[in-house]
Structure formats: C-alpha cells, structure tokens
Amino acid sequence: MQEANSHLSPEQARHLTQHGVNQNEDGTYSWKFDNYVRADSPYGMTQIEIEQLWGRISCPTLLVYGKESWAANPESDGRLRHFQNARVVSVEGAGHWVHHDRLQGFLELLRDFL
C-alpha cells in the first residue's frame, strides 16, 4: 500500500490494509471496495449529467486537492466552473487521499470551512 501512496505512514498503511480487506473462503484476500465502480459513476450517469448535477449544488462547496495527486486540479481542468458556489484549496505534500496524507491540515481546512 505504501508503494501506491508514499505519503502513508507504516501505521496508516497497516490500518487501511487490515480494515480494507476481506478474507475469502480459500484463504486469499480481496479488497472490500469494488474496483469496477472506482472509475465510472455507479449510477451510469454521463459526464454531462454529472456536470448538470454539480450545477444544481447551491450550498458552499470546498474542493480539496492534493498537489501531488494523480487527479487533475478541479480549477485547472474546468470542473470548478460547474459549481455555483465552490472553491478549490490545494494542499502541499498530499496526494489524492488528502485526509490520509495531511490529516491535521485537512481537518483545519474543514473546520474553517464549516
């Protein structure tokens, strides 16, 4: 797990692994989540439908982006423009899992936002 996310401490990697897998009947292990729904919407929504949904969100919205994430910055790639009242906060030293990579900084951002 640390190979995939070098920001994780050994303790975090162990915790996520222990709580993120199920043991199969044959003794092997499988992730609890379904990799097939990670890339696409589980509801079969098109990109246009997703953008229309974002456009209906009227409450203040905080998009937190780890600067070392594999995902694009929502401001740079245009996703931000679909929201009525959103802002992007970029976090140094964090990948896609900002809440794992920089927990205290993430919590501070969240508290300030709320």
Give residue ranges: language-model regions.
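Conserved loop-alpha-helix segment in the C-terminal half of the alpha/beta-hydrolase fold
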Residues: 56-94
